[in-house]
Amino acid sequence: MSGLIPQPFIDDLLNRTDLVELIDGYVPLKKRGNSHIACCPFHNEKTPSFNVVAKKQFYHCFGCGASGNAISFVMNYLNQGFTDAVETLRRAWVKCPRDGTGEKHKSSLNLYNLMSEVSQYYQKKLKYNGQVAIDYLRNRGLSGEIAKRYHLGYAPEGWHNLEKAFPNNQRELLSTGMLIKSDEGKIYDRYRNRIMFPIHDRNGRVIGFGGRVLDKDQKPKYLNSPETVLFQKSRELYGLHQVLSQQKNPDSIIVVEGYMDVIALAQHGIFNVVATLGTATSTFHIQLLAKHTKHLIFCFDGDAAGKQAAWRALESSLPHLNAGLDAGFIFLPNEHDPDSLVRNEGKNGFLELLQQATPLHRFFFDTLSKDINLSNPAGKTQLINAVKPYLQKMVEGSYKQLLIDDLSRLTHIESHRLTNLITDKSESKPEVQAAISRSPLRIAIALLLQNPEIYSIAIQQINPALLHEQEHHILLKLLQQLKDKPNANTATLIEFWRNSSYFELIVKLAAWDHQVPEQELTKEFIDVLLFLQKQNREILIRQYIEKSRKTGLTEAERLSLQNLLKERHGQAEIEK
């Protein structure tokens, strides 16, 4: 992105973004009082000191001092520049305008709406022009009801069907990956002669597609949408929307590897199934699933690749086990996938297999202890060293202790001794943040940044015109910000200063412990402002008196001095 992004757009973007939801997508948060906490993603710690306050749309780590709003988080966590962070945050329906274009930026067709229309187009093609696809689905034992539940469609043969169906949306279809532009500049449909599987986000919006070939000579067998502003495959799960629309918090969720596995199991009445989208099971996938269930069952092939995929899922699950999540693993016979197995064995046969799932802790130790002789000290040492790095990644809690107890039974070493051996002594210590010296001006700025709602009451009792234009520059700017936008929050207030030399100080003051009790915030702010006004008034009086002695005052200066002296006298009478 190039050009300047207008401040009103940035403010609107920050107001639209839910900081808790944003950060929770990367770092699992736990609600505590009026805020959410986690172990800081910016330094190594085991005791949570990272704090996110929804009301302020602001985060702060009490350990390392990392602080900011949604844009700051994306910049620092994803290592992005400012404009890329804005692009990451913006919703698909928000156009990102530029200053100086001299044009009104008309909103194009909403990308989500467009993808929904594309899905409907493919569904109609399946119904009216897709006999070859219908025959294939019937041969796989799939009913029209299941095809409708998952909105299956058909992309007919030909290079330009979709392009012709949406002649006014070529640019949007290119951006969502539905059309491809060749090196020679030719544009054509990505999907041709394929069964189409629309991919929904958890809110039910179509964000991408998967396509399965009908011609066995065509490659690849399955083709996913590319990464786009709507679709990041490592953050989505096929079928999750359908699972949650039927039951918000199912007892368990089964994780498989393919679309057809999800649909085949649904055909047999097993609906709590999701699939990864050609990627390993990620930490984000586990975070997402852990919000809706406490039990995961991973269903993989029994070959080496399946075992490797299962181990990656285990690694992603470990940090979440202390929160009550549990997981089991099913390894299918080599000649089967979930689709073929449920067709051969039926629903009951598959459910029986689920009951035999290997618990996570057993899979964990079976894998790490394989080929290790635990009857001698060398073997026990090998196992401890193999287990250690995994347990060190887990926060303290009951599940971690249970794993240590299992290790104790295997090695015949007491649990407390193993705990001492495994405890990470190298936890990084964050840099000690330099204390901010207290001053009335800094207290006023901090109070206003952290509690902008006090402005509407305080402004009735203070006179910003009596503040010093240079000495109180930041405070005056903040007051002006709130005059222009009375509903501003901490996030938008600090964003105004991003390109200023004061930005670092502003962010620190937004997180500063000013030690003012909540019930006294407004009174304290008014008292500090009145003190600053009085301080500035005395400076001006001294300057005028000194000038009158040296060169004399102009008429305007003489009147100004008289008014200041009257204010001083009036204030003195009030304070008697």
From Swiss-Prot:
Monomer. Interacts with DnaB. A zinc finger (CHC2-type) spans 40-64. GO terms for molecular function: DNA binding; DNA-directed RNA polymerase activity; zinc ion binding. Coiled coil: none annotated. Contains an N-terminal zinc-binding domain, a central core domain that contains the primase activity, and a C-terminal DnaB-binding domain. It is an enzyme of class 2 (transferase). Mg(2+) 1 binds at residues 257, 301. Its EC number is 2.7.7.101. Keywords: DNA replication, DNA-binding, DNA-directed RNA polymerase, Magnesium, Metal-binding, Nucleotidyltransferase, Primosome, Transcription, Transferase, Zinc, Zinc-finger. The gene is dnaG. Its cofactor is Zn(2+); Mg(2+). InterPro entries: DNA_helicase_N/primase_C, DNA_primase_core_N_sf, DNA_primase_DnaB-bd, DNA_primase_DnaG, DNA_primase_DnaG_DnaB-bd_dom, DNA_primase_Znf_CHC2, DnaG_bac, DNAG_N. PROSITE patterns: TOPRIM. One of its GO terms (biological process) is DNA replication, synthesis of primer. It comes from the Bacteria. Belongs to the DnaG primase family. Binds 1 zinc ion per monomer. Binds two Mg(2+) per subunit. Residues 251-333 form the Toprim domain. This is DNA primase. It catalyses: ssDNA + n NTP = ssDNA/pppN(pN)n-1 hybrid + (n-1) diphosphate. SUPFAM superfamilies: DNA primase core, DNA primase DnaG, C-terminal domain, Zinc beta-ribbon. GO terms for cellular component: cytoplasm; DNA-directed RNA polymerase complex; primosome complex. RNA polymerase that catalyzes the synthesis of short RNA molecules used as primers for DNA polymerase during DNA replication. Pfam families: DnaB_bind, DnaG_DnaB_bind, DNAG_N, Toprim_2, Zn_ribbon_DnaG. Mg(2+) 2 binds at residues 301, 303.
